[in-house]
């Protein structure tokens, strides 16, 4: 009895699934959707991307790009149980936001003016030509401090502050080529100590072959490496390279002398290796560029070249960015006559030492990359919805087609189906 009654009652219920407004419409317009409420759907948001770039000579382009996408769909249960009453069957809603920002400060060109030495007393202003090319790039690499010109005991190491690939280092490279010319004038570029291996040399405890080179050059400054001087031409000798003084016709070397491999650092400190030919043999070279500065100090008594470079790194755990700053302090002394060419004489004659502090602290380039992914969820927050379904959708206008229409006499069919549902529930639980 119950089975037969169930079959009879279920016939109009099942047939109600086929009732549509018009023939060929989607299931959104079926009888059940109109009976319990039409669900709402939201289409996936379109992906938006913007990019802007401006390139000016001496400046680095600034680019910004962003993209976002989202998708959501309301379940049909929303219409069945009322808005905000269930989260069953919710479609997964992924969301992704990506923002990339790269900003670089303009790079000022470097100008080198030649020394004017006119024999007849009519000095002519020198001619200076400066060419600056700047480029910026951001990448995720460990922060590495070059070991060039570092005073160590046994060699020339490369010092690394870590191998954390999460460090985001913004690197800006500036290439500057300077050409100077003037009547009866000379242009002098401070040299770089070069050892026998061809790389930047260091003064070790147990001896190191060093040479002095002075020539026209192209200077390349890197934000996270020591300033280098790339030679164009040089004359080499057996124990190093021989350099001609630009200020005279003398062939004697000025500044750093070549230390043979048989000599040791301690011997040069105690005995001293005097410099022949003009001047006090002391010189200081400062290469300062934005947030990185390198200073080389030379002395004829110590036969050494020292570089003061300080690099500090600050990393943010949230924005994954790194800001590099550097500062340096330079102390130079002048020794004219007396005291002998040794360590003690140099100390006695360095009373008139000049101490200066140069600070170059500025954020050269900052790169920030932020990416967020929301976890896939099978639920949806309906807290923003309010109210319940209070009325059924109504049909307006004229309808055509062979399908049954939910107007006029069909309202009695709806009442009949509700009655059958109630009777079925009573029969099942009695």
Swiss-Prot record:
Induction: Induced upon high iron conditions. Residues 88-195, 232-257, 278-302, 314-336 are annotated as: Disordered. It is found in: Cell membrane. The keyword Transmembrane helix does not apply. GO terms for biological process: cell adhesion. A lipid is attached at residue 401 (GPI-anchor amidated glycine). It comes from the Eukaryota. Its main location: membrane. GO terms for cellular component: plasma membrane; side of membrane. It is a lipid-anchor; GPI-anchor. Residues 402-430 form a propeptide. Keywords: Cell adhesion, Cell membrane, Glycoprotein, GPI-anchor, Lipoprotein, Membrane, Signal, Virulence. Residues 141-167, 289-302 have a biased composition (Polar residues). Putative adhesin which is involved in cell adhesion and virulence. This is Probable GPI-anchored adhesin-like protein PGA32. It comes from Candida albicans (strain SC5314 / ATCC MYA-2876).
